[in-house]
Amino acid sequence: MAKGKDVRITVILECTSCVRNGVNKVSTGISRYITQKNRHNTPNRLELRKFCPYCYKHTIHGEIKK
């Protein structure tokens, strides 16, 4: 039996360098990824290194609120 319900939630990861630069003149948007995380294993905000097609490099993508 499961201990609790809604343990695994859907989160949105957003590129931190696009947001910090205020969407610089070269980039045309902000990269976002949708993934899931287990709330019991990772209670704090999730940060993953993913590819940003607007920055043309791998950057840190942080979890944002919905």
From Swiss-Prot:
SUPFAM superfamilies: Zn-binding ribosomal proteins (SSF57829). Pfam families: Ribosomal_L33. Keywords: Chloroplast, Plastid, Ribonucleoprotein, Ribosomal protein. PROSITE patterns: RIBOSOMAL_L33 (PS00582). It is found in: Plastid, Chloroplast. One of its GO terms (molecular function) is structural constituent of ribosome. Its main location: plastid. One of its GO terms (cellular component) is ribonucleoprotein complex. GO terms for biological process: translation. Belongs to the bacterial ribosomal protein bL33 family. PANTHER family: 50S RIBOSOMAL PROTEIN L33, CHLOROPLASTIC, LARGE RIBOSOMAL SUBUNIT PROTEIN BL33C. This is Large ribosomal subunit protein bL33c.
